[in-house]
């Protein structure tokens, strides 16, 4: 049996995979799963296949303004562009002949052709259109009620010898696989979805050493001092994923007023008891927000009550900052939060559970934990309802 958890990118790819799956056996099932998210995934990869013209222009302008050239970390400190996107843009322009940029050791240096370089828009658009057409044909295959093998053959300009294959689910609907399942297995699957917690590992290094050193009054060294490091934490779920992950956006964006359900409190208590059976948490606080000032504190207070711990609001947001999800690389993510929090009141000693709704880059937890540790907390354990990370920095 061969199973595709999502649609292949094209009919040709799918046909080749079907051929490999059935090779050397007399009989095999091929099951293609599809859902609404398939088009979203395909669209994401199509859109991210080439660098954005805006990013390329900004990168080349920065390199052109530097006689000695710039390294990737230096580029990251100058522009709000993800490291992976900077690397993608540089790889793309350096593949051009002639190239507007060359690499000299760790730095990227402009060539005399830099001022004349233009992104090949027509070629990029042509390839993008081809990929959209491939995606549309794959969608049509999934929706088709005709013989599926004949559909594939027509797409490959190789008409089938017989009008019907007499094997696919459209030709033989009575031979389709059963849709009923063992209730015990369904229950186990539901339990698995509700136990999709992920570790929150502490960041060990600053992204912008000079800015962090000035803010915390410490030596300008790359490594974050041990006394300012948060402990390892946990994210309860994967944002938007089945089970608990869907309850987080429901509570934050669709509930009126925004409110996280008691089911999330129950699951958090269960996770903390399972993950930290021997570690004693001594108090609870949360990351403050000026956009939704009561959402996370309300949840953290209910969680603290269930854990029989005091809830102490000791962090205050001092200014409005752009959402962290708009910060594309580590330097901008770190510096967006420098000076954004302050301590109000007295910070209890002992191990603190620091609660937030979502975690992505981990810089919010990193900066807030450093502030709490410097103010007297003995340890800070971060806890988020969902991991919303999409990768990158």
Language-model regions, residue ranges each:
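Residue-level signal for inorganic ion chemistry
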Residues: 282-285, 380
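Active-site-facing substrate-recognition patch
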Residues: 189-283, 293, 297, 301, ...
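Structural motif
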Residues: 1, 29, 283, 351-353
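C-terminal helicase lobe
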Residues: 1-196
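PRPP-dependent phosphoribosyltransferase catalytic core
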Residues: 191-192, 366-393
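Cofactor-binding loop segments of dinucleotide-utilizing enzymes, especially the Rossmann-like FAD-
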Residues: 33-36, 357, 385-387
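Residues at the starts of beta-strands that form the adenosine-phosphate
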Residues: 29, 310-311, 351, 378-381
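A phosphate-binding catalytic loop at a beta-strand-loop-alpha-helix junction
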Residues: 354-368
């Amino acid at each position: 049996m061969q199973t595709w958890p999502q649609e292949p990118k094209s009919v040709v790819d799918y046909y080749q995979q079907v051929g490999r799956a059935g090779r050397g056996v007399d009989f095999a099932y091929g099951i293609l799963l599809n859902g609404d998210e398939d088009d979203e995934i395909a669209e994401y990869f199509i859109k991210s296949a080439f660098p954005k013209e805006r990013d390329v222009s900004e990168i080349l302008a920065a390199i052109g303004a530097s006689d000695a050239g710039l390294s990737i970390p230096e580029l990251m400190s100058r522009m709000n562009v993800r490291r992976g996107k900077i690397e993608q843009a540089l790889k793309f322009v350096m593949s051009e002949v002639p190239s507007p940029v060359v690499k000299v050791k760790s730095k990227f240096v402009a060539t005399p052709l830099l001022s004349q370089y233009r992104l090949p828009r027509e070629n990029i658009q042509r390839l993008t259109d081809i990929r959209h057409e491939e995606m549309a044909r794959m969608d049509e295959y999934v929706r088709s009620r005709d013989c599926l093998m004949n559909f594939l053959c027509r797409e490959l300009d190789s008409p089938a010898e017989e009008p019907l294959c007499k094997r696919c689910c459209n030709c033989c609907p009575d031979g389709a696989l059963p849709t009923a399942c063992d209730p015990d297995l369904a229950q186990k699957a539901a339990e698995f979805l509700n136990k999709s917690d992920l570790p929150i590992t502490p960041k060990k290094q600053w992204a912008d050493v000079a800015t962090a050193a000035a803010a915390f009054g410490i030596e300008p060294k790359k490594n974050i001092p041990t006394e300012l490091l948060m402990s390892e934490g946990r994210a309860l779920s994967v944002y938007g994923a089945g089970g608990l992950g869907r309850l987080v956006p429901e509570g934050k964006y669709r509930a009126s007023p925004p409110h996280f359900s008691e089911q999330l409190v129950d699951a958090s208590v269960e996770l903390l008891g399972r993950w930290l059976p021997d570690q004693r948490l001594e108090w609870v606080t949360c990351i403050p927000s000026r956009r939704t000032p009561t959402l996370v504190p309300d949840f953290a207070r209910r969680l603290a009550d269930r854990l029989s711990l005091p809830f102490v609001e000791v962090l205050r947001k001092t200014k409005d900052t752009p959402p962290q999800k708009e910060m594309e690389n580590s330097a901008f993510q770190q510096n967006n939060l420098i000076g954004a929090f302050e301590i109000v009141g007295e910070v209890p000693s002992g191990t603190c559970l620091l609660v937030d709704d979502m975690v992505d880059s981990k810089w919010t937890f990193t900066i807030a934990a450093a502030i709490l540790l410097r103010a007297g907390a003995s340890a800070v354990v971060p806890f988020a309802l969902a991991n919303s990370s999409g990768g990158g920095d």
